[in-house]
Amino acid sequence: LFFKTLCAIGTHLPSSHQKTLPALERPVNIHSPHFPDLHIACCTDVNYFTHTVATIASVLENHPHRIVHIHLIAEGVDAKDLAKLRLAIGAHNGLLYLYTPPADAAQRFRVHSSPRLSTAAYYRCFLADLLPRELERVLYLDGDVIVRKPLDAFYDRPLGNWAVAAVKDYGNITAKDFERLHIPEAHGYFNSGVLLLALEQWRKDDVLAQCTAYFAAHPERIVY
């Protein structure tokens, strides 16, 4: 019932003239004395808000034993829908934090290759810059991901000096894809829809700058 109620928030999408909520201004309550924290990040625009709400609902349904912190970068979403989402998450032992995407995001990542993609697909690259510096890690989930069981084992795994933990993509990745990307097949290809980010290491490695430079230098390689 909760899942259906929460998902219903995103069924009435707003016009482009309606206002969005401002970026988060108050400090993030990162620690709880009673339950361990689970920090989840999602990125969306008005076109994928409904799908993202379903992802968030599935996370909450499977983590009654944790305080779920949802960090949402949202563009063009109705303020009323975001307010309803905040209340629904709060009623389910969770917290919602809203962030505005950087003003230059569309210039850094200008999508030409696919009508299915929007600049929102690249907001994840900015997470380490937008989220609080005291936050050590966050699990990014695409808006088409449905969580079916607790994520504790993956979320709590040690990352060492790695900036990200990801899962190998076993989809329809062909030899032509590796050739286009100039990546040896032996290196594999990971699914960018589920990413466990070590935020400090991401900043140390300046991954955002690397992503921006690669996109600018090789836009023809970016088709997904």
Language-model features: where?
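Short, acidic, metal-binding catalytic loop of nucleotide-sugar glycosyltransferases
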Residues: 58-66
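Short alpha-helix within the catalytic core of nucleotide-sugar-dependent glycosyltransferases
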Residues: 82-86, 133, 148-160, 208
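Conserved donor-nucleotide/metal-binding helix-loop-beta segment in metal-dependent transferases, i.e.
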Residues: 145-181
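Catalytic core and acceptor-binding pocket of nucleotide-sugar-dependent glycosyltransferases
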Residues: 42, 165-172, 187-224
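Short aromatic/hydrophobic "clamp" motif used to bind/position activated sugar donors
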Residues: 138
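N-proximal low-complexity "stem/linker" segments adjacent to membrane-targeting elements
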Residues: 1-57
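Active-site-proximal specificity loops/subdomain of glycosyltransferases
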Residues: 83-130
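Short internal beta-strands
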Residues: 68-76, 165-167
